[in-house]
From Swiss-Prot:
UniProt-recorded name of the protein: Isoleucine--tRNA ligase
Chain ranges for the short sequence motif 'KMSKS' region as given in the UniProt record: 608-612
EC number annotated for this UniProt entry: 6.1.1.5
Motif 'HIGH' region: where in chain: 58-68
GO cellular component, as recorded: cytosol
Any one Gene Ontology BP term: isoleucyl-tRNA aminoacylation
Record has Transferase as a keyword: no
TM spans (from-to): none
Keyword Cytoplasm: yes
Gene3D superfamilies: 1.10.730.20, HUPs, Valyl/Leucyl/Isoleucyl-tRNA synthetase, editing domain
HAMAP family xref list: Ile_tRNA_synth_type1
Amino acid sequence: MTDYKATLNLPDTAFPMKAGLPQREPQILQRWDSIGLYGKLREIGKDRPKFVLHDGPPYANGTIHIGHALNKILKDMILRSKTLSGFDAPYVPGWDCHGLPIEHKVEVTYGKNLGADKTRELCRAYATEQIEGQKSEFIRLGVLGEWDNPYKTMNFKNEAGEIRALAEIVKGGFVFKGLKPVNWCFDCGSALAEAEVEYEDKKSSTIDVAFPVADDAKLAEAFGLASLSKPAAIVIWTTTPWTIPANQALNVHPEFTYALVDVGDRLLVLAEEMVEACLARYELQGSVIATTTGSALELINFRHPFYDRLSPVYLADYVELGAGTGIVHSAPAYGVDDFVTCKAYGMVNDDILNPVQSNGVYAPSLEFFGGQFIFKANDSIIDKLSEVGSLLHTETIKHSYMHCWRHKTPLIYRATAQWFIGMDKEPTSGDTLRVRSLKAIEDTQFVPAWGQARLHSMIANRPDWCISRQRNWGVPIPFFLNKESGELHPRTVELMEEVAQRVELEGIEAWFKMDAAELLGDEAPQYDKISDTLDVWFDSGTTHWHVLRGSHPMGHETGPRADLYLEGSDQHRGWFHSSLLTGCAIDNHAPYRELLTHGFTVDETGRKMSKSLKNVIEPKKINDTLGADIMRLWVASTDYSGEIAVSDQILARSADAYRRIRNTARFLLSNLTGFNPATDILPAEDMLALDRWAVDRTLLLQRELQENYGEYRFWNVYSKIHNFCVQELGGFYLDIIKDRQYTTGANSKARRSAQTALYHISEALVRWIAPILAFTADELWEYLPGERNESVMLNTWYEGLTELPADFELGREYWEGVMAVKVAVNKELEVQRAAKAVGGNLQAEVTLFAEAGLTADLAKLSNELRFVLITSTASLAPFAQAPADAVATEVPGLKLKVVKSAFPKCARCWHCREDVGVNPEHPEICGRCVDNISGAGEVRHYA
């Protein structure tokens, strides 16, 4: 038997079938570094329009988790796609470096008695070490960026820039000092930002407490009675017994109805709607003897249960009837609403009782409970209330309660003197910060759209921003306060610039070691130098100032306003939030045009990632076993707007999808053997109809992909590329052209036409996958024929694709119809193979019984219809002539019949043809193959 293998154009490529990503990706990273890829991108982008994605800084502590990887990969995919779209899209990664978590780590390692200077020194060293570790992990993901010059909030220039940003906000009239209840952590010894608060379940003691009336006559009058027949008391309900020693008022709703209830030995004031539930809870019988409105009770005095002082009734709209008694006890030092109400009634700061010290222990001077930790004092307080006859009921409940995000310990509201940025304070000029911010939200694009309402609600309802902290490792608030008036120095903004200049040279240490006289001269004795530091959310929230127009100026056409901020959905109350406030305070607009939020990673059952559940997926493990491109493909394949599921099984599915895409790319490369684009490419008008359709289909898909990349719909990009590879290419086009590729002359028009199409498809595909499969795209790029630059990323979307003319006879709709027919034929061939009626498809002969219109369409392919259907013979017959055993199909007006060919099999092309052996010199092959070997070669027109 003659071996005709040498006469075939068999596929051949050095592009490996096995990706070996864990080993290959580090080599590609080294190559990117050696050619200075990021620098070259900046060089070619000089004259392009700029797209600025500003990096939300991760905290410089610990190794990265899968959520970090997701975030960085999303950013990289956007910037790569923008680069391919013709933008200059730089990426300056950043780190958040100050704050309690790092200070806490240092204290745990070295102890709490280091001294402030040593603490700052060790914190800076620790953050530097952590950044280096995280940086290498981010680079391993294939993220291109300015890794040699990232921004760090602890860089001297950034620290100075933050002080300058604060000066701008001071200049705008937004900053003030005030006594207000703030989130307070005893372990931190400091106020916390809203974004540093987590909610966890906590067990608490609830108590119903009676406050005896002090003004009997006024209470009787309020209820329309001549006098009170018995002792009377008003009843409150609270989940914080420890606040009772600080009670200073009682709040009722002005519009609620309140009842005077006779319970035998005394009269109780309760909200009418709560009487039945309260009496049941107290196990008392009683009857309502009178009712009145809350407003009638205003300013009536009651007595504190165990201290010799009065608690007046104040009106408050925040009182609710969902639980309790309808009366709220007010400790203004430990509740925001309480504080606001008491201040509205004229209570001055000096009158506010605040017996809880910064460590959570009552001041020694507090009668009965001095020196006790507040949560441990609950039992003592309950006992005291019982002793004086004021305790009506107590029980333990489990409820959601605020905790410190770092220590996981319960927080309290605690009134302290702090620095605030006022939401409703009248600024030097223009609207209040709240009004500015709400307007800015309306001018911002949100992806997904629901983020707008969420951020709007948060801004509309948030309190003033407490920006001061009582810690060492933070950017200082460089204020001088007049010892007598408590006012800021009149040259505060000017002095802040002097401090900023020193900090730019020496870091924040410059402020802490500075003597006031250095700046104030003879005035120094009149002023206190403030030791507070700034909230870390102010650090990151002002990066638009100290990075985008400071350490890393972007030179955007419209100023230092980023096109995009992209972070997890928790940043609506974090970085998005703080950046919005500072941007509006300084520039009267948001520092971003668009906000994109992604959800959190969960396992495939929807559970949060937790070491205790053993469902944590570490990025390093994925890199070491599957490769970063598999992780990137997983990110791209998932709708990030909600929770994002990840597990070994899900990643395995991503790996399968990757293999299908890689195999398609390998097939394309292997069939471009011997193809030189400079000499072998055919103009569109010389290509076969099917090849022109394939290029046209590629062009249409490229337009869809560009649109989806532009809208950050990566899951659509992934799906469309995957389907194109598997269905339109693998399931249709590539299958059909194999015969032509392998059997026609190496330099024939039939083969060069297909190779031209494959080349165009390859040039497009390598760019399509580049934002997602960053490593594989550059690997593929090196194997493509023709001269090319060093990386696919140094190019834009492929422009060599041509569109089918509108009047082209075998146009888009035509090939859609042919595909449907091919699907129907394949389905029947599978049935026949399963029944062992035929072996391979090329053993089959198919007859298509079609209605006249379909017959006319299929007849346009002439004798090339068999190549499209990949059968040895394909015949057309009228639909009416279909025999009883013809199979109906899903294609209207089409039945078909498949039989095994009776003709011999060609040893070269494997088609079963009646002319096999007709040529005595080649007794084992068909006439077509003889012509392709030694004759003029077959001529194809369509497929």
